């Protein structure tokens, strides 16, 4: 594929890493793209791998982003060229702060988690009051008079009033994250590429470093998910103890 000569007994190309058949023939490699053989993260990327985005080469960004690089690199390029200053990340909108941890934006993830906790704690008692009022209303439908049903429904409406603004705040927070996610991720990736390139000028060493420090982390996302509920319940317990 890359044109390099290999030992007939080699199982893979010593230059690009492509698998070799027993006869030494080099089968078609779908990841081969514009001279960047052996880089699967460039698959689907239509931008020149040697071109730059804010001073970082596209091929290096692909190695650092890894998962879904074909989706993010065009967004990064458009933002860098001022073709599309405003973008929206639906995954970040629905799944933050866990998306932030998944993409190794752990500092932003911690900040967003703190904001969500600040909203969730006072919201808990309001939701509990709304749940209690709704349960009473549901029971009244089958067991009480029309007057009692009307009174129970009014209690539900009253309990819902303080919940709506807090839900609105949560929606605003998620919307903000949706808008800042792609620019934040681009800045993080470009900074990481430049830092790793300075430390590892050799391509092989750089690629090995990005496998460790780039990409995504399901473990970090899961840890963030568990950590959120541990901190939430701990703070809720402390608040209840202070009230008592």
Please provide the spans of the model-predicted regions.
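Hydrophobic alpha-helical membrane segments of integral membrane proteins
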Residues: 109-114
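Membrane interfacial helix-start motif at the N-side
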Residues: 71-108
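Helix-coil boundary and N-terminal low-complexity module in membrane systems
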Residues: 3-5, 30, 41-43, 85, ...
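Glycine-rich, often proline-containing surface loops adjacent to acidic residues and nearby aromatics
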Residues: 12, 91-95, 163, 168
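Transmembrane helix recognition focused on a "late"/terminal membrane span
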Residues: 27-76, 81, 116-244
């Amino acid at each position: 594929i890359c044109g390099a000569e290999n030992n007939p007994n080699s199982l893979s190309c010593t230059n690009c890493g492509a698998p070799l058949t027993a006869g030494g023939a080099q089968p078609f490699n779908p990841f081969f793209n514009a001279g960047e053989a052996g880089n699967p993260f460039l698959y689907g990327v239509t931008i020149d791998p040697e071109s730059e985005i804010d001073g970082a080469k596209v091929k290096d960004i692909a190695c650092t982003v890894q998962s879904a690089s074909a989706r993010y690199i065009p967004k990064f390029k458009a933002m860098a060229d001022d073709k599309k200053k405003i973008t929206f990340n639906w995954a970040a909108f629905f799944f933050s702060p866990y998306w932030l941890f998944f993409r190794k934006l752990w500092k932003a993830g911690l900040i967003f988690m703190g904001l969500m906790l600040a909203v969730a704690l006072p919201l808990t008692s309001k939701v509990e009051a709304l749940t209690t009022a709704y349960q009473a209303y549901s029971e009244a439908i089958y067991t009480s008079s029309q007057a009692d049903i009307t009174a129970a429904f009014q209690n539900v409406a009253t309990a819902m009033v303080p919940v709506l603004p807090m839900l609105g705040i949560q929606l605003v927070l998620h919307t903000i994250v949706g808008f800042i996610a792609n620019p934040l991720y681009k800045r993080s990736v470009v900074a990481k590429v430049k830092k790793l390139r300075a430390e590892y000028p050799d391509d092989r060493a750089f690629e090995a470093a990005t496998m460790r420090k780039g990409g995504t982390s399901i473990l970090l996302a899961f840890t963030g998910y568990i950590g959120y509920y541990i901190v939430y319940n701990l703070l809720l317990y402390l608040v209840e103890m202070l009230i008592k």
